[in-house]
Amino acid sequence: MVVEFTKSEALHKEALEHIVGGVNSPSRSFKAVGGGAPVAMERGKGAYFWDVDGNKYIDYLAAYGPIITGHAHPHITKAITTAAENGVLYGTPTALEVKFAKMLKEAMPALDKVRFVNSGTEAVMTTIRVARAYTGRTKIMKFAGCYHGHSDLVLVAAGSGPSTLGTPDSAGVPQSIAQEVITVPFNNVETLKEALDKWGHEVAAILVEPIVGNFGIVEPKPGFLEKVNELVHEAGALVIYDEVITAFRFMYGGAQDLLGVTPDLTALGKVIGGGLPIGAYGGKKEIMEQVAPLGPAYQAGTMAGNPASMASGIACLEVLQQEGLYEKLDELGAMLEKGILEQAAKHNIDITLNRLKGALTVYFTTNTIENYDAAQDTDGEMFGKFFKLMLQEGVNLAPSKYEAWFLTTEHTKEDIEYTIEAVGRAFAALADNK
C-alpha cells in the first residue's frame, strides 16, 4: 500500500517554477483525474517502477505504449550503451539504419521503402505531405477521436490528448487549416461514404488507426477497414495507417498484418524505438519516391536515423522475435480481463472492458464502446477516483479515462493476480462511496 508522495509533491511544486505546467507533455499531469501532483518516477526495471518517495508500482502505463519489453531490458540497454560509446550522432548514413529498415520491411510487407524520423508526430505529418504530393489534392480525412500527434493538421476532433468540416482542438491552429480536414465517426461506413460523395474529389488521403488506441482500445467492425480501402481508393485517394501505437504491439508486424488489410502508407513510432525517440514512415515504392532527394516532397531531420535510436530499435525487434512472446501477452491479458470483470460483478461496479491481446481499456459505463462519442459518454469522475485508488495500491495506470493498460513481456501471473486483488479493493471502496 502506497501512502507517501511527499517528494513527488515537492518536486512538482519546483517543476511548476521552471517547466510549463510542471510537465513536458500534458497527458502526464493529473488534471484529467481530479488534479494533484503527478507521481515522479526515479527508475524502472522489468514490469516495475519506483518513484522518488521509494514506492514500488506494477506498471501498466509502459510510457503510453513503447515499453513492450519492460523497463531497462538488458539486451536493449546494452545496444544503446554500445551505440553511445561509438558516438551518438554522425549526420551521415550508417549500417544500423540500413539493417533496421530491412527488419521493418521484412516484418511489414506493405513497406516497399522506409524513411526514419524522430517521432510518431513527424511520421504522420510527413505521410500527409507525401500523400498530397502524390495525389495533387489537399484535404485529409480522419476519424473522430483518433489522435495522430500534435501537428496543426491533425489537431482536429482529436482523441485522448485534446477531445464537421474541422474545428481546431488547440489554440494556435488556424480555422483555415482545420477546414482542410474532414472528420467522420469510426466504424460508420455510411457516414464515410456520404463524406466521400461530397468531398472525395478533393481528398488526398484518409488517416486510419486500424485498431484505435486513443479513446481506449477499440477494434474495427468486421469488414470496416476493407470498406474504407474500397471507398477511399474509388475516390482516388490514399489510405494512411497510423500504426504508432499498434505496430509490434499485437504481433510481430503491424495491425495491418494482423487484420489482413493493406494501406498505401504507414506511420510508425513508439514500440519500434525500444524506448528511445523514433518515428518512421513507409509504403508503396511509387508513392515513397515522391520524397526528396528522389521527389519534390521535402522532409529532413538532423537526428533522424541516429545510431542510438537505430540500435535500440533493432534490439527491441530482436527481443520481440522470441517464440511465444505474443501468446504470453494474450494469455496474461485474458487473465487480467477475466479478473477485472469478476471484481466488477462482485462489487456491482458498472464497467465495459475492451481488450485485444496485451492491451485493454476499462470504461466506467455499461454501453458498448465502438466510437469516440461512446467513449466520451463514460464516467470520468469515477475513473479519476479509481486511478488514485490503484495508485495507492501500487498499480500505475495512465491518468486518463481514454488510455489503454499495456502489458509488457516482463509482467508475470503473480503481477496479474496482485492487480486483480487491487482492483477488487478499489472497486469495494468505490462501491462504499456511491
UniProtKB/Swiss-Prot annotation:
It comes from Bacillus thuringiensis subsp. konkukian (strain 97-27). It is found in: Cytoplasm. The modification N6-(pyridoxal phosphate)lysine is found at residue 270. Keywords: Cytoplasm, Isomerase, Porphyrin biosynthesis, Pyridoxal phosphate. This is Glutamate-1-semialdehyde 2,1-aminomutase 1. It catalyses: (S)-4-amino-5-oxopentanoate = 5-aminolevulinate. Pfam families: Aminotran_3 (PF00202). Belongs to the class-III pyridoxal-phosphate-dependent aminotransferase family. HemL subfamily.
